[in-house]
Amino acid sequence: MAFKNFKLETDADGIALITWDIPGRSMNVLDETSAIELETIVKETTADAAIKGVVITSAKEAFCAGADLSMLEGMNRSYAEVLKGKGEEAANQMLFDNSRRFSQIYRAMETSGKPWVAAINGLALGGGFELTLACHHRVAAENPKTRLGLPEIKVGLFPGAGGTQRVPRIVQPQDAMNLLLKGEALTLDKAKALKLVDAIVPAADLIKAAKDWIKAGGKAVAPWDEKGFKLPGGPVFSKNGMMMFPAGNAIYRRETYDNYPAARAIMSCVYEGLQLPIDAALRVESRYFAHILRSKEAAAMIRSLFLSMQELNKGARRPVDVPPSKLKKIAVIGAGFMGASVGYVSARGGLEVVLIDRDQESADKGKAHAQSVVDGLVKKGRAKPGEAEAIMGRITATADYAALKDCDLVIEAVFEDRKVKAETYAKAQQHLKDGAIFASNTSTLPITSLAEEFKDQGRFIGIHFFSPVEKMMLVEIIMGKATGDVALATALDYVRTIGKTPIVVNDSRGFFANRCVMRYIAEGNEMFLEGVPPAMIENAAKMAGMPVGPLSLSDEVALDLGLKIMKATEHDLGPNAINQDHKKLMVELVEKQGRFGRKNAKGFYDYPEKGKGQKSLWPDLAKLQPKHLDPDTLDVEELKQRFLVVQAVEAARTVEDHVITDVREADVGSILGFGFAPFTGGTLSYIDFMGTKKFVELCHKFTEKYGSRFAPPKLLEEMAAKGETFYGRFPPKKAAA
């Protein structure tokens, strides 16, 4: 029988070789066709007496990237249809049966009575890695870039094809929990040390090694199916188990504040499953998986962190009639920390980079920063010396603007000062080649006004990076009023080249990300001035799902920079454009107390020298508060809601103001740009899943109690009255082919 996604061959020794190769895809995924065909293959190889064993591998560079999450999203749509037509019991049964399909196929492999070997030739994640765990032997091809793991938790799910049951039956409970709850990918060496891989061999010997294991009489029985099998960490109710699970629950609560149902389900699956035979344990896993699959958190995270992000990365916002840019060489003007980092990630992406500053010494310092980054990667084993040398070889440091003459794209990353930027543009324009695109990395100054200093405003655009550039995945592309399609296409092509996720926004003060995150920081200041204890402010924010508290974030941004932005805004727009009480607080901290934030080791927090303890809130902070509220009288849930609502309502305003024109970008941008509670799916999904009517009611309540910053825009009032959602009213367009 011919298959679409697999090739099945049997050699003279009776060993079947299954080669996975989905046509038209760069990676194999577990989709509907793969399920049907793999199920058929398992049945055929099991029934064929001539087949002595089975090897499964991939024809692509990677083994399998995991489940096709759009298939899982489709299961939820089917659930809603069956729920409407046949009721809850029928819908639940349908979802349970469909969602455990791969789990059942893998169990059929495992109990086929014939030895199965996974010949892992590259990346194996999620359901792809679970497939290998159901094989009786796992052999991997040597490759320092290969990663194995179960990242489902990152999109609000958990491994539902046996991962929560097989992993803790192979490795120690603590290691199993780390793998399942963190979703981090393992190197081959780490996987082998944990016994998740049995052997690592040269790539040329991979299939031979897999077949040799079968020929040598490899067992066709999983360890947990053998009589007398003992769990690596002992029974759940043993001394070790009792040390593990109560502590694990405490750690889970500390890390997630119970915002992620999938994490709780993992704990339950492992705890309950390890007390049962494997078949019953797999049914337990499947029941929890079906429950989590229909949770709003999973729906929101799958949509934003997988589907939307994938569409944006593929060029959903790219003008279709502009040919590919074919970037080869770029320049970064300003070799400070930000500019040097932009230069590094560009060189890492394979581009030639000219790093320019006011003098050679400053330019060399920028290149030295890039050198320190690659040296760190080599030291950690995350890059080979040859790769590091190649990256550094692509960076040229200079003070000579004439080096711009053959650059396709120039990114300005100089000081946030209009005069300095204008001088830079005047120098640069003398040397730009025809058709070169010019971008500013400004984080605060409107692009349209900056473009006035540029001759051809159609070639001027904003490319806003987030710090630290090496780690932050988001890039905000800002369209000035005159920015043309070629500039936009070039910027998007550039962001794709350096492996980051773009969002495209229209020009306004603060653009999108800073508009929202400044509301978060300001709400922290507001609570501080209300008399909420500083520790309570920080903890409530983290409980709401934010990665760091607003006071800590202020320190990271730099208090003196925050004050400078306030003063610039006041100068441009007048005294009513800023909160004067907040300015007074910043003046006290920065100008009177000399506290600039992490940069000088003192801000809202005190920062000890490296290696000498953790940061702690400045003991004298309370003296700067005009009053002090009793923490026992404060509603923590309301504090949490204030942090999320104030950011979400600002995001809604950016839609009304046409700063955001694609709802996906608000959600993806808010999570990647400033860590807005990922379990919500982002700022607009937070509103949609709460319901616009309920959200507007909450806004009115907070407006009456705390002020106009919570007032919903007219657009949101209108949507609430009609029962609309953002994704319903503004359905996103699909990515360009």
Protein language model regions, located:
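Short, active-site-adjacent cap segments at secondary-structure transitions
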Residues: 61-65, 125-126, 445-446
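N-terminal glycine-rich phosphate-binding loop for ADP-containing cofactors
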Residues: 4, 11, 21, 72-79, ...
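Amphipathic alpha-helical interaction surfaces in cytosolic regulatory modules
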Residues: 33, 47, 60-77, 106
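Gly/Ser-rich catalytic serine loop of serine hydrolases
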Residues: 118-128
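Conserved CoA-thioester-binding segment of acyl-CoA-metabolizing enzymes
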Residues: 1-57
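Structural motif
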Residues: 15-19, 37, 55-57, 117-119, ...
